[in-house]
Amino acid sequence: MAESVERLQQRVQELERELAQERSLQVPRSGDGGGGRVRIEKMSSEVVDSNPYSRLMALKRMGIVSDYEKIRTFAVAIVGVGGVGSVTAEMLTRCGIGKLLLFDYDKVELANMNRLFFQPHQAGLSKVQAAEHTLRNINPDVLFEVHNYNITTVENFQHFMDRISNGGLEEGKPVDLVLSCVDNFEARMTINTACNELGQTWMESGVSENAVSGHIQLIIPGESACFACAPPLVVAANIDEKSLKREGVCAASLPTTMGVVAGILVQNVLKFLLNFGTVSFYLGYNAMQDFFPTMSMKPNPQCDDRNCRKQQEEYKKKVAALPKQEVIQEKEEIIHEDNEWGIELVSEVSEEELKNSSGPVPDLPEGITVAYTIPKKQEDSVTEVTVEDSGESLEDLMAKMKNM
């Protein structure tokens, strides 16, 4: 009896996986993006419950982004749809990116459930198929292209190069950005090689093996250091990942750290594509101290990658060809130069009085101040009246009061 129940449970799980796989392979009907609504041709800022873009379009109204609708014209390739890559893909999908190209050779496992995005019923499906099915339901306006293979093999590398150079929103045009969300050195170097050869801008990301730190890095071939110039991560040497899995050893992973890294990666992507804020060339994250170091790295003139050295030479020529801009220092205009009467504006309260009336202000880093200070509690001043003892009794005092 117990064996038959176990067999039936296994059969149910197999059928659920097959059903999920069939659903992910279904071709959307005309006018239907595969989700629960029809495709929206134009983004709108109208504030109604049925508009999924109203909160995003508010960025334009508030002056953060000048043209948010432009996000639908971009195509982004994500290599690695794991703990960081899947969340990155979800965020970009919710933001309304034009097209996503997903690359991963792995399958969804129950061991992935400690991370974000994937669900237990998707176990056994390829990560790219499971991701496409979920993402299409979230936002049917986004175009998806998925590739279930390992980009590091010789036969797949050329196809990978072709898709990032011709798989843009308009076929034959390159993608606008490549995002590396892989977890091994070989795949990072493969992406680095392809992007250096094509002159393709990309962003690299990673989480440490102890799961409490991570980083993102913007790499513009020729302008900034490539992954071969200065690898930002120390990867364990002479370790075969497959043998580690066989021996029951694996790296730690926290959904919190991966979510933070995916968040700062997508934030950097949006700033880069939509041209707002400051784009970070390198941003680290240390969860133990809540520390976010930033820096930028110049390319190495002796880089081992010849295409990197070639891109550096082309970038130098490009900079040299730019017209030199003369910096004209404007003279500050003096307002009310004549002050015949020597009038000065003086505060009614001195700095010392203001300091004494305010509470203690903590030592804060540069650029941070308190919103307000709590005034010190003023002790009520009570005037003490001293009465001398006359030595008279209460009856004598009462008699004096009656005679008054």
Curated annotation (Swiss-Prot):
The active site is at residue 250. One of its GO terms (molecular function) is UFM1 activating enzyme activity. It is found in: Cytoplasm; Nucleus; Endoplasmic reticulum membrane; Golgi apparatus. The modification Phosphoserine is found at residues 45, 358, 393. The keyword Metal-binding applies. ATP binds at residues 83, 104, 127, 150, 184. Belongs to the ubiquitin-activating E1 family. UBA5 subfamily. PANTHER family: UBIQUITIN-ACTIVATING ENZYME E1 (PTHR10953), UBIQUITIN-LIKE MODIFIER-ACTIVATING ENZYME 5 (PTHR10953:SF9). Homodimer; homodimerization is required for UFM1 activation. Interacts (via UIS motif) with UFM1; binds UFM1 via a trans-binding mechanism in which UFM1 interacts with distinct sites in both subunits of the UBA5 homodimer. Interacts (via C-terminus) with UFC1. Interacts (via UIS motif) with GABARAPL2 and, with lower affinity, with GABARAP and GABARAPL1. This is Ubiquitin-like modifier-activating enzyme 5. It comes from Pongo abelii. The lineage of its organism: Eukaryota, Metazoa, Chordata, Craniata, Vertebrata. The gene is UBA5.
